[in-house]
Each structure stands twice: as structure tokens, then as C-alpha cells.
């Protein structure tokens, strides 16, 4: 871990400089939205951008540096970020399946191209550069398991990339989704997936070191499916719920909408800051008496409620944050590479002021993500043509 030197300005001022720089960047990138849908692609990308930033900041604060007050409060919502990714995945897959049913094998082929091609490129790169520059050699079985998407643990400095635990968890949903999907009852598929995910996480049949992370993220994917089902519109008919929400967003009561957005933002901020059982002692006591695991229940509930508030905010706002959109476009690439780059090959935190290092890493992730897409996109097209 890196011990930061905050110099004469101190930790608090360092955090405020970073926050101010990000706020200015967000405001400069603000544009009037061109979309009319509630959850169009630009909004999805903005949410993914927000999610990956929350994850990156948390990994810096709680894993990379010794002082976990660094980047507070930007660093407290990694779990919310993971839930946003799972929610958007469930939402997007359900929207696609409701428009055009896809056979299971075709679904798997497309997931293989979208997820595994970038994953394989990054893994091969990391295995090679770690061996050449760090003389760190991974066991053949470990490399094979990684290439198959199996990451049963999340050891920050021992695994090739500890955040890859998410890949294995996501693959479970991907494997089950086309097998259980019911076009007339996607809500039932969502419930079945949530039940399976909770059973797997609670029973932990394989006794996985990473299960504590699985238990915090069992329901977001299914919630995305349910929202997609609730907002779907059939040919020749309009969805009354969608029409009411659009009318509220675009209608003549902006003050009410602004007040709602403000309240939701405050709720999201409060829940993100109070996400432990110790923050809700009476609820924790009641859950414990009912033989629920209060830590996981409260941790997941506050994360999902925070996520829900943010999704409503982004759906009802009439402006776009191009900065978040850009990070959303390269969110998967940033996810794949940010931790090993910072943990093993960092130069910025070691040689730059603490306030400047994360502000340099962020555009670096965009540039690296752009480069990785330039490599993986033609590879994916080749696989799509020949497989």
C-alpha cells in the first residue's frame, strides 16, 4: 500500500481540491439531453460512468493507499457502483430479449464476444507483463481458471486482478438468464434468478473466499429485469406508467421535479454514508432477532436504495453529463485494468501530489480504454464472423 504525503495543505484540502475539480468538469460537460426515453443509452452510459468512478475511488481509498479518509466521500459507494452495473445488465438484456427472443446458444456466443474477448486480452497482457517486469509467475491452473472466468477469491495484491470476482458472479446470471427467460413473465424469471442468487450466496456451497461480496449483490440484476418489464411498450400501444413519468419529466411543474430530485439526491447521499449495521441499531437488532444476517441485509438494502434513487434522478433529469457518459463508454475497459495498473505499475501516486494523482489517472483510464477497444473491437468482429 502507498503512504501518501499531503504536504502543507493536509488531507481535507486535498479531498476538496479533487472534489472541486470533478464538479467543475461535470458542469463544463453538461449538455441538454436529446433523448425522449426514460432510460436511453446515454443515461445508461452515464450511470455506468458514475458506477466505475465510485469503484475506482473506493479501490484507491481502501486498497491502494494507507489512509482510507483519502477521497472521502467519493470512496464510499463501490457497492452501489457494482449494483448499478448488475442492474443495467439485467435491464439491457431484458429489453433486448423482449424485442427479439434469442436462442440460448446465440446469447452465449454474443456474451462470449462481449465479455471474454476483452477479458482474455487483458489477462494475457497481465500474465506476460507481470512475468517480464515483476518476475511474478502464475500457476498454469490459476491462469486456465482465470481464462475461463473463474475467480473464487479477491486478494488485492496476490490475484492477477482482485476485482475480477465480479466476472464470475455475472457469468452465473448470464448462464441462467436465457434458460429461465419467459417473454410473457420476465418478472417471474427475475424472481427465480434472485432466489437462486440468494441461495448460492447464503449457502456458499463451494466455500469461496469471495462469497462475502456475492452476498452483497444478489438482487440488483433481477431488479433491472423487473424495471425493464414495467417500462416495456408493445407495438401499437403505450405504457401508461411510461407516459406518466415522461409527462412528469417534461411537463409544466419543474419546481416539483427539482424538489424531488433534490430529496432523492439527499437520500442517496445519506444512505451511502450510513450503509453499516451500526448505523441502524434498532433495525439491526430486529434482524438479528429474526435470525437474519443484519450486516449483509442492511449493506445490500442501503446499496439498492441508493442505486434506485440515483437511477430515478438520472431518468428524470433533462441534462446530460458528457464526462460521465465518456467514462460509461469505457467503463468495462476501466474495470478490467484500473486495479492492476494502480496496484503494481503506479507512477502517479508515487511521484505526484496526492491531489493530482487521481486527476491524472482518470484521463489515463480513458486513453487506455480507448486503446483497448481499438484492439478488442476488431477481434470481436472476427470472432463474430467465424464462430
Task: Describe the residue ranges of each PLM region.
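Aromatic-enriched alpha-helical transmembrane segments of multi-pass intramembrane proteins
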Residues: 4-18, 44, 48, 54, ...
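Membrane-cytosol interface segments of multi-pass membrane proteins
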Residues: 1-196, 330, 350-387
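Active-site environment of divalent metal-dependent phosphoester hydrolases
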Residues: 62-64, 130, 213, 229, ...
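Hydrophobic alpha-helical segments and helix-packing faces
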Residues: 169, 216-220, 302-306
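Alpha-helical transmembrane segments of multi-pass integral membrane proteins
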Residues: 7-22, 79, 87, 122, ...
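Structural signal for membrane-spanning alpha-helices in multi-pass inner-membrane proteins
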Residues: 59, 93, 126-130, 201-202, ...
